[in-house]
Amino acid sequence: MIRTWLSDIRPLYEEHRYRRYYDTLPAFRKEKADRLRFQKDRAQSAGAWILLEKIRKKYRITEKAAFNLSHSGDYVLCSVDMECNEQTQVGCDIETVKEADLKVAKRFFCPSEYEAILREDNQKLQRDMFYRFWVLKESFMKATREGMALDMSSFEIRLSSPPVL
C-alpha cells in the first residue's frame, strides 16, 4: 500500500527554524539544499526530506522502501510504499495551480487528454482538468524513474476511478 503525506513548509522560511532542521539533514541533502539560490527553494528541498524522515521514524519504515517526493509553493508531498516491496514503483507530484496553458496541453498531452480538457464548460474546469492530467502524468514519469526524459505523449491517462494508464 502506498500512502501519501502533505506538509506545509512555511515555518522553514524562518532562517532559525530552517537552520535547526538543516543541521539534521544528511550531507548529500545539505549539499543539494546549499546549491539552491532562494530560501524558499532550500526550504522545499529540506522540508521534503524532513517529512520523509518523520514518516520513516513514525512508521518504522526501512530505507529500502520506495518513496517519492514533490514540492510546489508552500507544500511538500511524500509518498511511501508501506510494505517495502522491492517491485513497487512510487511517483507523486504536487503543483501550485495557476492558469492552464492549453498550448502546453496540446503539445505535450495525448490528443484524448487535450480534448478532455477542451470539453470542460469553462476556464476554471479546464484549468482543473489540465492540472489533474499534469500531476498524474508527472507522477507516472517519476515512478518509472525516467522523469522528464519520458515523452508525456507516449502514454495516455484515462480518467476513471482510479485513473488508468
Where are these regions (language model features)?
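Core catalytic alpha/beta fold that binds nucleotide/phospho-ligands
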Residues: 1-165
